[in-house]
Design a protein with these regions (language model features):
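C-terminal and inter-domain tail/linker signature
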Residues: 1-172
Length: 172
């Protein structure tokens, strides 16, 4: 059972993500501390400090988060005393520029499935940081920018296995 504080953290995170998806920059920023940081780890996209995070959200994320057919499914959530970790399955068709995920890559029209882990820190009832992880090689393979032949790289299969652990493991 979550404590009152943990329930507030979850509600704030859900408000934050909802504002991102709705393209509401002011509400997105209102959920964050005065000195937040944001790091999309595989691409190092993000920002530091309120002005840096706001600029990143304005220019690259809010209202431009994913193509219109995006589907997200929460797989698991762990809530601690000052942090939350959300594991998410995401699928979309790469029909728009998604430069935080694929900087400099024009839309390919390819279907993408990915498992994402979001680590969210909280301080004084606000989000202090987000560290976001995914398998960039798998995404690049799915859109045709990386040939997985001979490499220890999978594509959509790795994301699907997060949803269904009974799927066969890859044997090397």
């Amino acid at each position: 059972m979550l404590s009152d504080k943990q329930q507030r953290m979850v509600a704030l995170f859900e408000k934050h993500v909802g504002a991102e998806m709705a393209g509401d920059l002011d509400t997105t920023m209102a959920t964050m501390s005065d000195a937040p940081h944001l790091n999309h780890v595989p691409t190092m996209a993000g920002g530091v400090g309120a002005a840096g995070v706001r600029a990143f959200y304005r220019d690259h994320l809010v209202g431009k988060f994913f193509p219109p057919d995006v589907k997200m499914q929460s797989v698991s959530r762990t809530v601690g005393e000052a942090s939350l970790v959300e594991e998410i399955y995401i699928s979309f068709t790469h029909t728009t520029v998604v430069d935080w995920l694929l900087p400099g890559v024009q839309p390919t029209g390819k279907k993408v499935e990915m498992a994402v882990a979001v680590v969210v820190g909280f301080k004084d009832d606000k989000i202090s940081h987000e560290h976001i992880y995914w398998d960039q090689a798998g995404v690049l393979a799915q859109i045709g920018l990386l040939d997985p032949k001979g490499l220890p790289v999978t594509g959509a299969e790795s994301a699907r296995k997060v949803l269904d652990p009974r799927l066969p493991a890859r044997v090397f």
